[in-house]
UniProtKB/Swiss-Prot annotation:
One of its GO terms (biological process) is ribosome biogenesis. The lineage of its organism: Bacteria, Bacillati, Bacillota, Clostridia, Eubacteriales. It is an enzyme of class 3 (hydrolase). Keywords: Cytoplasm, GTP-binding, Hydrolase, Magnesium, Metal-binding, Nucleotide-binding. Its cofactor is Mg(2+). HAMAP family: GTPase_Obg. The keyword Ribonucleoprotein does not apply. One of its GO terms (molecular function) is GTPase activity. This is GTPase Obg. Its EC number is 3.6.5.-. GTP binds at residues 165-172, 190-194, 212-215, 282-285, 312-314. Its main location: cytoplasm.
Amino acid sequence: MFIDIAKVFIKSGKGGDGAISFRREKYVPLGGPNGGDGGDGGDIILKVDTGITTLLDFKYKKKFIAEDGENGGASKCYGRAGKDLIIKVPMGTIIREEESNKVIVDLSHKDQEFVLVKGGKGGKGNAKFATPTRQAPHYAEPGMPGDELSIVLELKLLADVGLLGFPNVGKSTLLSMTTKATPKIANYHFTTLKPNLGVVAVDGIEPFVMADIPGIIEGAAEGVGLGIQFLKHIERTRLLVHIVDISGLEGREPFEDFVKINEELKKYSVKLWDRPQIVVANKSDLLYDDEVFEEFERKVKELGFAKVYKMSAATRDGVDEVIKEAARMLKEIPVKELEISEDEMYIPEEKKFTYAIDIEKDEEYNTYVISGTFVDRLLSAVNIHDADSLRYFHKVLRNKGIMNELREMGIEDGDVVRLNDFEFEYLL
């Protein structure tokens, strides 16, 4: 099964908590703090794997969560960092942020790696909080939470040459005759339901990658059939080989088909429409009258194309000429990165980690309630039964401006302040 788009949720690892510990050793009655730091959480890393050609793995696994860092230990032992989670993706995968649909990264190079989200920093142990005036801190810092993100993976095949044309014109036959690719071939429409890639390696020419794009039909640019899905795979190709069934045995008019396909390209992307094309009149062995080819060639040249190649993929007649022309043109067409404007790029906000603080007055009980993620983090860092730890606790409240805000709200001496399950009386 060929899967070229997937949505997944990712989350980096949480940092380990710093330890609260004191040196306990015989003959050392006043051993100081020796709590170690927590380890950093694991990162989420994307890596290109050329052995993968589809996003099928993401059809069954939708969540990727990196390992948390270990908590710090006694004797200044640092917690082990969480293992990074490496997610392998096919070359040509574009990563978008789901909500905005903006591009985070274009993974288009062999073995390319990209750190998608960093793990949370490990918290400091109480050894780091010791000062000449605070020699035995009974508090430590909890680890920072990991980052999370919902992303869309979109695969756009990387090929030098794209085979373009209506269904059943001979694209798969040409690919199978010139590469080791084995696309399904049969004499009916939509035999090919997924793109196929093959490497053209012929003596005397530089090898190149060719893609058989499933047959595009009229209205593809508006999403008729699987048009949009197929058209996007052509975007990365440098050269198009536009194949037309010149025999007309299926009741189609070759020139009309040629024009319609180009109209679909233009509707989808002007840049794609403007891409160099080699025009190929296939199934020439079934042609009953050479005038049909000559008329087609004349009309195509009137549109500005220099030449039409007469070919029969089934008998290999004219195939070598088309392949050599493709190789020649590729030498003159520079390799370009996928163009992504600033407006299309997802730029994450710089995270100076801040925690929400909410202060409300409970009129019924005349209590000031402080809540939010800041409270959760602060309470997890202190020992409320230790006087030194409580002094640190009140210092943080002052430094964060919470005490000033309480005074502005009209708090009075003896009023109760509650943080989760912890309460204290406010004293002027």
